[in-house]
Design a protein with these regions (language model features):
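Amphipathic cytosolic juxtamembrane alpha-helices at the membrane-cytosol interface
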Residues: 61-76, 80, 100-103, 107, ...
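Hydrophobic residues within alpha-helical transmembrane segments
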Residues: 8, 68, 80-84, 109, ...
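Alpha-helical transmembrane segments
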Residues: 145, 149, 202, 253-257
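Glycine-rich helix-loop "coupling/hinge" segments at transmembrane-helix boundaries
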Residues: 126-130, 156, 204-249
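Hydrophobic alpha-helical segments of membrane proteins
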Residues: 79, 83, 87, 91, ...
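Transmembrane alpha-helix boundary and packing residues in multipass membrane permease domains
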Residues: 10, 94, 123-127, 136, ...
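Generic hydrophobic transmembrane alpha-helix motif, especially the helices
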Residues: 53, 84, 89, 94-98, ...
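Gly/Trp-centered helix-boundary motif
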Residues: 1-86, 90, 94, 101, ...
């Protein structure tokens, strides 16, 4: 029940994040607003004042608009990373587990990639390439598929030589058909679980790489940028809302994805359905 409630809330938050700019009365997240009477730029307006729902930052930008724009950016990065890791991981995992001739090659490739810290790769790519959404997606996806591929490979090894698969090979069924019809349907729950856990990990990586100054530029709202900006003013009691609101959104999204992923894993595990 908790997982279902979290799932409903998470879907609502994600849907609102992407629908928010199309709702009436929304403003540009990069617009620096000024007082219409005095013409002076707004600075650090408290939440609920001057029409700012969640307040403004030091240059008059609406935090309500920026936080939802940041959530869209971070979620977009996370969704693409999860999709790329799933496609590459499934492809490599199936070949690794089903085609015996490729086992040595993929095992050595796995050993090489697995011994290179993914954080180091992400930092190096972000440092060498210009900061952009595409750069972050590339850096996170470059080795992120390894865990998915290994998991798929292990599952393939378990079901590869079952009677119905051996029979299919004996009657000349194409390998591609065996994989699609006999193997992948058993892996749907595993794939969904891995993707659900990849999303919060990717969001966390975006926040981390932006926090150390190698992430997206300040012109692109992201949860990492917003938390980094809030950190700079957190010692001023009246400005802590600039850190509080993006942190709440980040915490909810990452924890919800993690708990839902674990609940989905438990529900899909046959051991939990034994009488």
């Amino acid at each position: 029940k908790v997982a279902v409630a979290l799932l409903i809330a998470l879907v609502a938050v994600v849907a609102f994040a992407f629908l928010q700019p199309h709702l009436p009365g929304q403003v540009d997240p990069n617009l620096c607003e000024v007082d219409p009477v005095t013409g002076i730029q707004y600075r650090n307006i408290a939440p609920g004042e001057q029409g700012f729902i969640w307040g403004s930052n030091a240059i008059g930008q609406d935090l309500w608009a920026r936080i939802w724009a940041g959530a869209r950016t971070s979620l977009t990065i996370a969704f693409f990373v999860a999709l790329i890791e799933a496609v590459v991981g499934i492809t490599v995992g199936v070949l690794w587990g089903y085609v015996r001739q490729l086992d040595f090659f993929f095992t050595e490739l796995y050993n090489i990639c697995d011994n290179i810290p993914s954080t180091i790769i992400l930092i190096l790519i972000s440092y060498v390439a210009s900061p952009s959404i595409q750069t972050l997606i590339l850096g996170m996806s470059l080795t992120g598929w390894i865990a998915m591929a290994r998991f798929i490979r292990n599952q393939i090894l378990i079901i590869r030589d079952r009677d119905y698969n051996i029979a299919s090979r004996c009657i000349g069924t194409p390998t591609s058909r065996i994989v699609v019809r006999n193997l992948l349907p058993y892996l749907v729950s595993v794939i969904m679980l891995r993707m659900a856990l990849t999303i919060p990990a990717a969001i966390g990586s975006e926040v981390f790489i932006t926090y150390i100054g190698l992430g997206l530029s300040v012109e692109i709202p992201s949860l990492g940028n917003l938390i980094n900006d809030g950190r700079k003013v957190m010692m001023q009691a009246g400005l802590r809302y600039q850190l509080l609101y993006p942190t709440i959104i980040l915490s909810f999204v990452t924890i919800a994805f993690y708990l839902i992923g674990n609940a989905f894993s438990d529900a899909a595990d046959p051991k939990n359905h034994l009488q």
